[in-house]
Amino acid sequence: MLMLTSQTIDGKRISRYHGIVTGDALIGANIYKDIFSGVRDVVGGRTSAYERELARARELALSSMASAAERLGADAIIGVRLDYHNLGGTMGNTILVSTTGTAVSTEDEE
C-alpha cells in the first residue's frame, strides 16, 4: 500500500476517493518497568527501549490504516498524518499513536 503525506502521486491520477481511513496503536511507557527489568538503555539522553516501542506502535497504526484502505478497495493513501498523544496513567504514561489519511484508487497518467 502506497502511503504519502502529499495530496498527489507523481505519475498517477486519482480515479476515486474512498474516504478517510485511520489506524491507532497504544503503548504503555512505564518507567518503573524499565528500571526493574534492566532495559534502561540510555544513549545520548535517549531511551532506545521507548524508541523501539514508539516505532512498533507507529508501524501497527500505519498497518491498521492500510488494512482499512484495502477493505475499501483503495491502492494508496494520501494526506497521511501521524499524531502522538500522551494519555497519562497511574503507573507511567500511555502513548496513543494515531494515523489518518484519505484512501484513493489510482491510475497511471497518460
UniProtKB/Swiss-Prot annotation:
Which protein family is named in the record? Belongs to the UPF0145 family.
Give the matching PANTHER family. UPF0145 PROTEIN YBJQ
Name by which UniProt lists this protein:
UPF0145 protein MTH_507
Species per Swiss-Prot/TrEMBL record = Methanothermobacter thermautotrophicus (strain ATCC 29096 / DSM 1053 / JCM 10044 / NBRC 100330 / Delta H)
Q: What is the lineage of its organism?
A: Archaea, Methanobacteriati, Methanobacteriota, Methanomada group, Methanobacteria
